[in-house]
Swiss-Prot record:
Native source organism of the sequence: Debaryomyces hansenii (strain ATCC 36239 / CBS 767 / BCRC 21394 / JCM 1990 / NBRC 0083 / IGC 2968)
EC number: 2.1.1.41
Catalytic activity: zymosterol + S-adenosyl-L-methionine = fecosterol + S-adenosyl-L-homocysteine + H(+)
Protein's GO biological process: ergosterol biosynthetic process; methylation
Name of the encoding gene: ERG6
Xref: Gene3D superfamilies: Vaccinia Virus protein VP39
GO cellular component: endoplasmic reticulum
Keywords: Lipid biosynthesis, Lipid metabolism, Methyltransferase, S-adenosyl-L-methionine, Steroid biosynthesis, Steroid metabolism, Sterol biosynthesis, Sterol metabolism, Transferase
Pathway annotation from the record: Steroid metabolism; ergosterol biosynthesis; ergosterol from zymosterol: step 1/5
Name used for this protein in its record: Sterol 24-C-methyltransferase
Annotated Pfam families: Methyltransf_11, Sterol_MT_C
CDD domains: AdoMet_MTases
Entry similarity comment: Belongs to the class I-like SAM-binding methyltransferase superfamily. Erg6/SMT family.
Length: 377
């Protein structure tokens, strides 16, 4: 890990103009229809801006470049993949545990409810969602607890979509979504009762950086809950196969660097948090593995509607989508580079599954932490 990371320059006006040029009004659409509405020139800029970091770059110098350009790397990634995520997965961009008889959407909601329950979020709280995506978890947690939530996101397109959905589902009195870099938040200190992050802070170049910002905006005695993406204690960075899996996850998921579990734990403690609960929810020996939607194992499908979801997310479904997008690209219906994006997502899926099977990776290392009520103690 570099001793220091250069924070990104804040230029919200420039980012907003680029997002508008690229996406236009496509935030009102979904899936491949939204993809077809992108501006071709701006899409190429986003594509080049992302993939320049992954041209076989496995050296320490390549890694440091990705870490220093964390903000642009992540913003370009989500400019490219958001429509694919919603098409294949829905509006909650995270994994979940699965139980027998439980539908995919039900499992997704329960995973969000579990976090809110562990954090004891209630209707009197003002809550921050760090890396909120298009607002799926925020909407669900708002309905579950009746709390007020502010979603923080560095991607203008996702903010547009999140606010659009909040208005659509008449939750805009409780939900708001704002632009910001989670490594340098603009909120007043001690302004939130609770903060959560669901599979989002993995995009931070240094975990202490984002955790310290969360600590700063949290009120004394406030709670922070996070589902963190980490490599497990079984991961060996000197093992070529292990490193290949980690790199495949990084490339396909817009991550500057995957860190081990011990790094996340140390980072939380170093900024002042007291860890009240921790558990790797992927290491529970469940009958149905968390990665089954990507591995496409039909024996685990629990409901009729899930056959359609799992078909889209399975190897076969992903291949069909990739070839269809490639054809659309050739016909000029999709931006240049769209197939390259689906290939990267395929690389991510393969390595996420393999990392899960070998228990080298978890997307749900759960930490529930407390900011001391009296920091002088």
């Amino acid at each position: 890990m570099p001793s220091a990371v250069q924070l990104a320059e804040k230029n919200h006006e420039k980012d907003s103009k680029f997002a508008k040029a690229l996406h236009g009004e496509s935030y009102k659409q979904t899936g491949l229809k939204a993809l077809m509405s992108k501006a071709r020139d701006a899409s190429e800029v986003a594509n080049d801006g992302y993939f320049k970091h992954w041209d076989g770059g496995v050296t320490k110098e390549d890694e440091d470049k990705r870490l220093s350009d964390y903000s642009n790397l992540t913003a370009h990634y989500y400019n490219l993949v958001t429509d694919f995520y919603e098409y294949g997965w829905g509006s909650s961009f995270h994994f979940s545990r699965y139980y027998t008889g439980e539908a995919f959407r039900q499992a997704t909601a329960r995973h969000e409810h579990f976090l809110a329950h562990k954090m004891q979020i209630n209707e009197n709280m003002k809550v921050l969602d760090v890396g909120c995506g298009v607002g799926g978890p925020a909407r669900e947690i708002c309905r579950f607890t009746d709390c007020s939530i502010v979603g923080l996101n560095n991607n203008d397109y996702q903010i547009e979509r999140a606010n659009h959905y909040a208005r659509k589902y008449k939750l805009d009195d409780k939900l708001s979504f704002v632009k910001g870099d989670f490594m340098q938040m603009d909120f007043e200190a001690e302004s939130f009762d609770a903060v959560y992050a669901i599979e989002a802070t993995v995009h931070a170049p240094v975990l202490e950086g984002v955790y310290s910002e969360i600590y700063k905006v949290l009120k004394p005695g406030g709670v922070f809950g996070v589902y963190e993406w980490v490599m497990t204690d079984k991961y060996d960075d000197e093992n070529e196969e292990h490193r290949k899996i980690a790199y495949g996850i990084e490339v396909g998921d817009g991550i500057p660097k995957m860190y081990k579990r011990e790094v996340a734990e140390k980072a939380l403690k170093s900024v002042g948090f007291e860890i009240e609960y921790e558990a790797d929810l992927a290491d529970k020996e469940d009958d149905i593995p968390w990665y089954y939607p990507l591995s496409g194992e039909w024996k685990y499908v629990q409901t009729l509607s899930d056959y359609f979801t799992i078909f889209r997310t399975s190897k076969v479904g992903r291949t069909i989508t990739t070839e269809a997008v490639g054809l659309m690209e050739k016909l000029g219906l999709a931006p240049k580079g769209s197939k390259q994006v689906t290939n990267a997502l395929e690389d991510a899926a393969v390595n996420l599954v393999e990392g899960g099977r070998q228990k080298l990776f978890t997307p749900m290392m759960l930490y529930v932490c407390r900011k001391p009520a009296n920091e002088d103690i």
